[in-house]
């Protein structure tokens, strides 16, 4: 496989060193100095502050939309069937969430109000792929796509199921805290069967391979190596929730990252590591330096964060095997039962773990979050999961407004253009070499998809909290998916479903 030497100048383009940003810049500049297409357009966003991280454009423009695409970006006024005055507001590429587990209508609604136009399930993935895509066709508010999941393949093989309507790590059976698929070592024949499932998923258009060895401690190093070999052979991205977290070594986050980097080096696979802050905790800067070193030596590695100091997962998962307090540096009171918001005791921990359900884990240092957010190659992904009776982690509801409101406007940790790059362009660039449809996203230029977010930079903020997560973000004025409004005047638009599937096929 072709190799290259990555550098900071590459940012997050992965192997695509000559980014589509260059092409977008050329197209936009040529268009601005040429003849505008004739109107009227279906929709015109008039007089907004257009910010395009790909070209660096930051100025007042008028955007014309036709046939789901951006048809004009003009300094002169345009005529539209529907014209919306967006003066005083920022018009940016729609936000792309590479780590969205809440693949439901409710999840879409929360994310739309947070400015998201594309929500991808890339960590856990799903299976079978055709079933997963067909179940969402014509019903999605946002663009959608998924990897084929290693965990899902493990469930299928270890439970000897011939066919499942949909297998997903986000739909675990909670009746057994130690099912075979989590803790049992697979035989060579079973690993072969898993690889077969994954390969069929890739043929069906999955966006890559998703892995979560933290949830499958029975998966051997050989098993994971086989998955990395498959990703390299099929030339797709691998997404991974690393095997272990925390600062206690061996068996902590450095150990886990070394396993990932060794597999990348040995196979030539491209990898994206999810939520680096909840893996590294106080060691996050050290992990980022390891990733920098790997990239400088030609390995194709990227990562992400979510802007919260708490993680979330299933209480019955392998992450809470004995010794978790020492590994994570926390105690029972730092674990919050999502359904009620209560902090746990030893007694309630034992009771709820036997029942199964989501918890919020308060364990990420603010300094680790800021180190990742300011790092030039780290993008944003929510890791949002479905709420349970209105309870849960707020990251699936307020991630993007939180970045813009708290970390840009209020605390000035990063500037606005940098933030927009991390929440729109960078995820598109990371995927575009492997998924051609992503070349048309994350950018404002003629010919790009009309996935656009319009927000008030003076008002945008998250309102979702750990105690009350089911609260929409504020200041996201309009959101368009393929040129169709899904949010207008900060209200969800009823009876629209413009979301389109994103698969590896163009």
Question: What residue ranges belong to the model's regions?
Answer:
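Alpha-helix-loop-beta-strand connector modules within alpha/beta enzyme cores
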Residues: 139-144, 227-236, 240, 266
């Amino acid at each position: 496989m072709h190799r290259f030497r990555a550098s900071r100048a590459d940012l997050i383009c992965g192997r695509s060193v000559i980014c589509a940003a260059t092409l977008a810049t050329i197209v936009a500049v040529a268009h601005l100095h040429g003849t505008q297409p004739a109107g009227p357009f279906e929709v015109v966003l008039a007089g907004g502050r257009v910010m395009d991280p790909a070209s660096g454009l930051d100025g007042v423009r008028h955007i014309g939309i036709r046939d789901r695409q951006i048809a004009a970006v003009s300094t002169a006024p345009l005529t539209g069937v529907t014209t919306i005055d967006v003066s005083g507001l920022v018009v940016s590429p729609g936000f792309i969430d590479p780590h969205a587990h809440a693949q439901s209508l409710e999840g879409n609604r929360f994310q739309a109000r947070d400015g998201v136009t594309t929500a991808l399930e890339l960590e856990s993935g799903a299976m079978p792929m055709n079933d997963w895509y067909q179940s969402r066709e014509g019903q999605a508010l946002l663009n959608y796509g998924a990897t084929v999941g290693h965990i899902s393949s493990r469930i299928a093989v270890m439970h000897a199921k011939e066919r499942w309507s949909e297998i997903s790590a986000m739909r675990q059976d909670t009746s057994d805290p130690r099912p075979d698929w989590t803790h049992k070592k697979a035989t060579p024949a079973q690993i072969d069967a898993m690889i077969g499932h994954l390969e069929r998923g890739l043929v069906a258009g999955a966006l890559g391979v998703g892995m979560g060895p933290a949830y499958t401690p029975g998966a051997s190093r050989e098993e994971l190596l086989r998955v990395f070999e498959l990703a390299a052979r099929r030339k797709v991205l691998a997404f991974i929730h690393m095997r272990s977290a925390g600062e206690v070594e061996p068996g902590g986050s450095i150990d886990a990252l070394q396993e990932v980097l060794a597999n990348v080096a040995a196979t030539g696979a491209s990898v994206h590591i999810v939520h680096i802050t909840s893996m590294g905790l106080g060691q996050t800067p050290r992990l980022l330096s390891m990733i920098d070193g790997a990239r400088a030596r030609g390995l194709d590695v990227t990562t992400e964060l979510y802007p919260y100091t708490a993680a979330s997962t299933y209480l019955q998962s392998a992450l809470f095997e004995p010794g978790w307090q020492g590994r994570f540096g926390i105690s029972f009171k730092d674990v919050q039962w999502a359904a009620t918001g209560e902090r746990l005791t030893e007694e309630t921990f034992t009771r709820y773990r036997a029942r199964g359900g989501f918890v919020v884990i308060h364990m990420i240092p603010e300094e680790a979050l800021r180190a990742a957010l300011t790092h030039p190659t780290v993008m944003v992904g929510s890791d949002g999961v479905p709420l349970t009776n209105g309870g849960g982690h707020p990251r699936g509801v307020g991630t993007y407004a939180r970045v813009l409101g708290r970390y840009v406007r209020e605390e000035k940790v990063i500037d606005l253009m940098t933030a927009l790059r991390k929440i729109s362009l960078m995820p598109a660039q990371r995927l575009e070499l492997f998924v051609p449809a992503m070349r048309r996203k994350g950018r404002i230029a003629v010919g790009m998809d009309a996935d656009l977010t319009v927000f008030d930079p003076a008002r945008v903020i998250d309102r979702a909290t750990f105690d009350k997560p089911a609260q929409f973000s504020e200041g996201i004025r309009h959101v368009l998916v393929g040129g169709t409004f899904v949010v207008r005047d900060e209200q969800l638009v009823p009876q629209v479903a413009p979301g389109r599937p994103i698969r590896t096929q163009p």
